[in-house]
Design a protein with these regions (language model features):
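Classical nucleotidyltransferase
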Residues: 149-176
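Conserved alpha-helical substructure of the radical SAM core
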Residues: 6-7, 11-147, 158-159
Length: 176
């Protein structure tokens, strides 16, 4: 698995070019198209630059769902994900990331595997919050176009708890 790890640069790139980090990707983006998957609304990572509260409010009103919050998120189901993915061309690149931490959805690894098995190029942008050892085992065989890890930063732009589980998952991912 090829990984890109960045600290401060991630935030700048995220704000300027959410999923396009170099000329090659720019060209690929324009040729094949791109679909960004947000697996949930109500991300508890609560990055300073993310409009999560606005997203929760807007999604709640549009979907007529009450009480979406950091402690009560709304997850995309695997069935809904399959319905969406099956409608886009196979050459379209699929990116997991954006306005939520994809691995907070317990079905994220299953979605990534399905995307790869469907023939789509796959990208992941993640803080790893919510990622389990089982998730790593499910996805370690996938040749990601990009797997970018947003590590904890000193100013705490993202609320990432650096504990034994987080360190162990990061080490396992890097060794896979």
């Amino acid at each position: 698995m090829s990984l890109i790890i960045s600290w401060d640069v991630v935030i700048l790139n995220f704000l300027v070019f959410p999923t396009i980090f170099n000329t090659t990707n720019c060209i690929r983006f324009h040729k094949m198209g791109h679909m960004e998957i947000n697996t949930m609304i109500g991300c508890r990572v609560d990055c300073d630059f993310c409009p999560q509260t606005l997203l929760m409010d807007k999604y709640s009103s549009l979907a007529n769902i009450e009480n979406i919050s950091y402690g009560n998120p709304s997850f995309m189901s695997f069935a809904d994900f399959k319905t969406c993915l099956d409608k886009i061309p196979k050459e379209m690149e699929v990116s997991f990331g954006g306005y939520s931490e994809a691995f907070l959805n317990p079905e994220c690894a299953k979605m990534i595997v399905y995307t790869h098995n469907s023939g789509h190029p796959v990208e992941v942008y993640s803080t790893l919050v919510g990622m389990t050892f089982e998730d790593i085992k499910q996805i370690e065989h996938i040749p990601f176009n990009i797997f970018l890890i947003h590590l904890p930063d000193e100013p705490m732009y993202a609320k990432i708890a650096v504990n034994k589980n987080y360190i162990a998952a990061l080490k396992e991912l890097l060794s896979s």
